[in-house]
């Protein structure tokens, strides 16, 4: 591999997050450059954060040297992908491993986005204060410098085995129902923040029994104005009576008031009307960045839609995928249908793979996303919203006040899934078994405050090593359901023509 190595900073479009992350980026870059020099390379830095696709095209496109992207916070995938797609120079994605500064989340999203467009990239990560002192990181970096790629252990990636007759029968029934009536996804916008890996489109959705109907988010600005005040007041009374705890007017959230919650409920009702108008089965909702300065955050609305107890509801959830992510929408809708076919509540949670650590000899991931986690994760009473807490979304990211749909996830066995696009253009369903784990209060609070305290929390064993997730997982998002529906999902995915990949230590 060539001696010269270009080091660049993938960035957020928003200036504030980049400003906050600059000290971390500088420190990590200094350590990375020291490591590269130690390995006999000559690193140089591409100027500044890449905050728009055109900057990636202009600054990365002309570079033929090997390249390293340094991820220390959330970054948009096109700020890397658009500058390197179609090229074959060695590319390494290198991230920190921090809950507070989620570079690993951006690495997972960018790696999956690169895979979906057929661009090879290697991955390396470290939680060490000094990257040069992490032996495992240095070993991976040395391998990349020597060969242009890193080959990670793949022993926990498997083909699925045979499934039992009962699971096959349920899968066959769900597949037949989809054959009779195609799943219609209402898409409010296309992806969010450049999540290339989260958009499939009709060419990939039609063959697996899905269709999408796109509605511009601008409709919401108009539609929510015509919602009758009486409906908003009834919805407001409903969520209070059902047990939601609202954290209005707390420090750093003085502008989060009952009126802000009512504005969110008005938006929820407008979306409910759109779902009814188009008779859609499920929903993908972009929100960011288009509505950021116009309407309150969508998170409380999404949490309600993913709950059985909701205003003007029918006793069932409406599967809702935040950030219009079809890679989670597909498995969430399929898991809901399998659960209901098994006579179980059709609740499926949407989360980010945010951070992880050892606890009592066991690796646990903190799964944490501001939207799309329903109340069933926090209590097992389908008629209640107890355990739901609504905090103001952090104002540094969300200027219009509005609340989240947070809580502590119950312990229990889980099945998890994710659909992604491989470099040949085909769909793959990742599946695994795991467990939602109850942590001691002090540990949970420390982990929660080390990430984002306002968002719903799950500590989960995903049934495979952290190295397998970091090296091979093709998203920062994951769909989680309580119970064991692994075999049914294997059979259903195969029936619909989706290739299955199992992630498991056994």
Each model region followed by its residue ranges:
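Residue-level signal for secondary-structure boundary elements
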Residues: 149, 342, 500-504
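C-terminal catalytic subdomain
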Residues: 309-444
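Active-site proximal loops enriched in glycine and acidic residues that flank catalytic Cys/His/Asp
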Residues: 9, 286-287, 350-354
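Intrinsic low-complexity, intrinsically disordered or marginally ordered coil/linker segments
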Residues: 143-156
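Extended hydrophobic packing segments that form well-structured cores
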Residues: 389-506
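Anion-binding alpha/beta catalytic cores of soluble intermediary-metabolism enzymes, centered on
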Residues: 101, 105, 112-115, 124-142, ...
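Metallocofactor- and cofactor-centric catalytic cores in central/energy metabolism, strongly enriched
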Residues: 1-119, 124-139, 154-186, 191-282, ...
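Long, internal scaffold/assembly segments composed of regular secondary structure
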Residues: 231-341
């Amino acid at each position: 591999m060539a001696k010269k190595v270009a080091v660049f900073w993938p960035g957020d479009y928003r200036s504030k997050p980049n400003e906050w992350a600059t000290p971390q980026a500088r420190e990590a870059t200094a350590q990375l450059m020291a490591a590269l020099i130690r390995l006999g390379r000559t690193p140089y830095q591409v100027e500044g954060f890449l905050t728009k696709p055109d900057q990636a095209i202009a600054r990365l496109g002309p570079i033929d040297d090997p390249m390293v992207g340094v991820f220390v916070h959330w970054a948009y995938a096109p700020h890397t992908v658009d500058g390197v797609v179609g090229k074959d120079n060695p590319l390494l994605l290198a991230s920190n491993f921090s809950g507070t500064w989620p570079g690993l989340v951006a690495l997972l999203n960018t790696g999956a986005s690169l895979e979906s467009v057929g661009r090879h990239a290697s991955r390396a990560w470290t939680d060490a204060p000094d990257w040069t002192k992490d032996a495992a990181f240095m070993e991976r970096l040395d391998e990349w410098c020597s060969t242009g790629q890193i080959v990670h252990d793949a022993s926990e990636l498997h083909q699925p085995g045979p499934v039992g007759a009962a699971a096959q029968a349920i899968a066959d029934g769900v597949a037949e129902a989809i054959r009779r009536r195609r799943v219609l996804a209402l898409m409010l916008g296309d992806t969010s923040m450049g999540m290339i890996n989260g958009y499939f489109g009709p060419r990939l959705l039609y063959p697996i029994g899905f269709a999408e109907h796109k509605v511009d988010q601008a409709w919401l600005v108009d539609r929510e104005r015509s919602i009758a005040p009486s409906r908003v007041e009834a919805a407001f009374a409903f969520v209070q009576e059902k047990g939601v705890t609202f954290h209005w007017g707390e420090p750093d959230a003085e502008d989060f008031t009952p009126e802000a919650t009512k504005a969110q409920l008005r938006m929820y009702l407008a979306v409910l009307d759109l779902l009814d108008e188009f008779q859609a089965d499920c929903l993908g909702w972009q929100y960011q960045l288009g509505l950021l300065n116009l309407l309150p955050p969508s998170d409380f609305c999404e949490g309600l839609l993913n709950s059985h107890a909701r205003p003007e509801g029918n006793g069932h959830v409406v599967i809702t995928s935040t950030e219009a992510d079809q890679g989670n929408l597909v498995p969430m809708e399929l898991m809901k249908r399998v659960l209901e076919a098994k006579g179980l509540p059709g609740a499926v949670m949407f989360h980010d793979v945010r951070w992880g650590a050892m606890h009592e000899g066991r690796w646990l991931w903190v799964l944490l996303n501001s939207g799309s986690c329903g109340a069933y994760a926090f209590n097992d009473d389908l008629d209640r919203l107890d355990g739901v807490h609504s905090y103001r979304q952090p104002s540094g990211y969300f200027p219009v006040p509005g609340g989240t749909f947070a809580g502590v996830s119950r312990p229990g066995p889980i099945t998890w899934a994710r659909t992604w696009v491989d470099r040949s253009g085909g769909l793959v369903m990742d599946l695994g078994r795991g467990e939602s784990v109850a942590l001691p209060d002090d540990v949970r609070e420390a982990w929660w405050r080390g990430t984002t305290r306002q968002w719903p929390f799950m500590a989960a064993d995903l049934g495979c090593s952290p190295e397998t997730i970091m090296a091979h997982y093709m998203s920062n998002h994951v769909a989680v359901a309580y119970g064991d529906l692994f075999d049914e999902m294997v059979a259903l995915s195969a029936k619909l023509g989706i290739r299955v990949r199992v992630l498991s230590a056994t």
